[in-house]
């Protein structure tokens, strides 16, 4: 499956499960353009609500993307934060890497 088809499938899945105002950001080698065929798909899910994420949020928002990866025979690795949690990580290298190389693929 071609890269754009995979991104389209990820967007379609996100559209079916994500709450309004949330964002899905592709980062890592797939975003930088240096991915190999066996490279995974790193996704940051930013939920548009305050507070903290929990197991129910992972099951509701991240798990459908993991399942999509299984169906497409690719590895999709979603990381889930609320906007509030994400802003608290502004001092981390991870935050800066995602801000620098990340591509918003759904909002």
Language model segments and positions:
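Short beta-strand->loop micro-motif that forms the acidic, two-metal-ion catalytic signature
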Residues: 41-46
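Catalytic core of pol beta-like nucleotidyltransferases
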Residues: 1-25, 31-37, 48-107
């Amino acid at each position: 499956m071609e890269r754009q088809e995979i991104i389209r499938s990820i967007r379609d899945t996100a559209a079916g499960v994500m709450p309004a105002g949330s964002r899905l950001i592709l980062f890592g080698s797939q975003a930088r353009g240096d991915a190999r065929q066996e490279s995974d798909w790193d996704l940051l899910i930013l939920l548009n609500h305050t507070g903290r994420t929990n197991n129910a949020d992972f099951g509701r928002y991240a798990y459908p993307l993991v399942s999509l990866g299984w169906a497409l025979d690719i590895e999709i690795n979603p990381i889930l934060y609320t906007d509030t949690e994400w802003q608290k990580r502004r001092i981390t290298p991870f935050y800066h890497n995602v801000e620098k190389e990340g591509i918003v693929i759904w909002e």
